[in-house]
């Protein structure tokens, strides 16, 4: 079992219940899922680009992503309905906790010129969204085997009712927010 999951069950639940005055442990916010999304607009011209993106995402997430396709044709972007334009993966359970651990302990400290995560990226309902500019911050990616530096979106969905609860939950997991 992941260390962060043990920490959540042993200390975080009690801390948050005390801080927000919850009467039941089921009221305490928890992380529901983590969604990774990689938009690969260049895949319209070359199908191999999508294969590389899927390979990278599989290595990072530990499970195979779903290829997302264009819903509408847009002449300005030279895409047609049904063209593959990205990939996404939703992590839950054990894989989610393991990914969160790697994100906080290994990947985030490897971001170039890192000055802390923005605390403004909460959506009003306690969910946190962040962008990563380079997939090479993850140790699973072999720098010599990548064809192009790609970024991705990481969304952490929680059961928190508001941003304050969501921030307290992520703070308990040592997320490095800007002061």
Swiss-Prot record:
Protein name (database record): Large ribosomal subunit protein uL5
Keyword RNA-binding appears in the UniProt entry: yes
Alphabetical GO biological process terms: translation
PANTHER family: 60S RIBOSOMAL PROTEIN L11-RELATED
Protein's job: This is one of the proteins that bind and probably mediate the attachment of the 5S RNA into the large ribosomal subunit, where it forms part of the central protuberance. In the 70S ribosome it contacts protein S13 of the 30S subunit (bridge B1b), connecting the 2 subunits; this bridge is implicated in subunit movement. Contacts the P site tRNA; the 5S rRNA and some of its associated proteins might help stabilize positioning of ribosome-bound tRNAs.
Record-linked InterPro entries: Ribosomal_uL5, Ribosomal_uL5_bac-type, Ribosomal_uL5_C, Ribosomal_uL5_CS, Ribosomal_uL5_dom_sf, Ribosomal_uL5_N
Gene Ontology MF terms: rRNA binding; structural constituent of ribosome; tRNA binding
KW Lipid metabolism (keyword) present: no
UniProt xrefs under Pfam families: Ribosomal_L5, Ribosomal_L5_C
Transmembrane regions: none
Summary of subunit composition and partner proteins: Part of the 50S ribosomal subunit; part of the 5S rRNA/L5/L18/L25 subcomplex. Contacts the 5S rRNA and the P site tRNA. Forms a bridge to the 30S subunit in the 70S ribosome.
One Gene Ontology cellular component: ribosome
NCBIfam families cross-referenced by the UniProt entry: PRK00010.1
UniProt entry keywords in alphabetical sequence: Ribonucleoprotein, Ribosomal protein, RNA-binding, rRNA-binding, tRNA-binding
Protein family according to the UniProt entry: Belongs to the universal ribosomal protein uL5 family.
């Amino acid at each position: 079992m992941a260390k962060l999951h043990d920490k959540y069950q042993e200390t975080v639940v009690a801390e948050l219940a005390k801080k927000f005055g919850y009467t039941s442990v089921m009221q305490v916010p928890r992380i529901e899922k983590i969604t990774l999304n990689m938009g690969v607009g260049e895949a319209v011209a070359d199908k191999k680009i999508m294969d590389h993106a899927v390979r990278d995402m599989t290595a990072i997430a530990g499970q195979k992503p779903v290829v997302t396709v264009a819903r509408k044709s847009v002449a300005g972007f030279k895409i047609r309905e049904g063209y593959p334009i990205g990939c996404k993966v939703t992590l839950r359970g054990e894989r989610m906790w393991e990914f969160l651990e790697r994100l906080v302990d290994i990947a985030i400290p490897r971001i170039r010129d890192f000055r802390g995560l923005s605390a403004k990226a909460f959506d009003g309902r306690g969910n946190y969204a962040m962008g990563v500019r380079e997939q090479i911050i993850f140790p699973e990616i072999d720098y010599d085997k990548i064809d192009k530096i790609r970024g991705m979106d990481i969304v952490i969905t929680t059961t928190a009712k508001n941003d304050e609860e969501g921030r307290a939950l992520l703070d308990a997991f040592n997320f490095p927010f800007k002061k």
